[in-house]
From Swiss-Prot:
InterPro entries membership: Expansin_CellWall (IPR051477), RlpA-like_sf (IPR036908)
Biased composition (Polar residues): 83-97, 150-162
Annotated region described as Disordered, given as residue ranges: 53-97, 113-167
Protein name as catalogued: Allergen Asp f 7
Amino acid sequence: MAPIFKSLALVSALFAAISSAAPVNLDKREVDVVWTTVTTVVWTTIDVTTTIYPTPQAPTPPVVESTPTPTPSAAPEQAEPIETSTQPETTKSQPTQPSVATFIPVAAAAAAADSAAPIPEEPAPQPATTAAPSTSTTTQAAPSAPPAANSGSTEKAASSGYSGPCSKGSPCVGQLTYYDTATSASAPSSCGLTNDGFSENVVALPVGIMTDADCGKTVTITYNGITKTATVVDKCMGCKPTDLDASRHLFGELADFSAGRIDGMSWYFN
């Protein structure tokens, strides 16, 4: 029995040594690794202003409206009454024939009645020949009418740009500002044009008086004793009827840019 106890004692001592040597961590926990991905989204708002201009197709119709179309209709109307005037001329030639017939009995008493028959036949073609030049006079009267119509239209066209408000005799007085002209063909001015505002003297008329026919017209501007001429290429949406919006080059020739807006500017259409 003694050897068994000894072996048991040795085994228990061995287990005690092993248990004391092995660390015991009762509070040990599993370590969890957590990966966190943070995404930051930044929204940036950019204000973009787009100006939409109407298509500049209106200037062409006034050019197409030419006066030659009514002139051919007027020529035949004048030719018809003139042709009626030729008819009484033929009636006047007819009484001459019986006057010749009155001489026939005198010739019949002197000679034979048969010889008098060919005599009235000869004067018959004579009034026909006189009728021919009368028709030629009608052809001369017809072309004389169209120039009169054309002269009236040219007088109206010449007087249309020189009367009314903002004319040389009655110039408009208002404010003058400056703007950046249209330089891109994709966004032209209201007249369908692009201009270099840093080198050209151009203006925009007030929207209240601007028409398509004003595109390309020139105006004379006077301020502080300085007079300049500019071409109309655009319309100003915020201008009063007597104001103008000028290119930078034109404004710089009349005043300093620091003024921004000048009063007492007078202008008129040329």
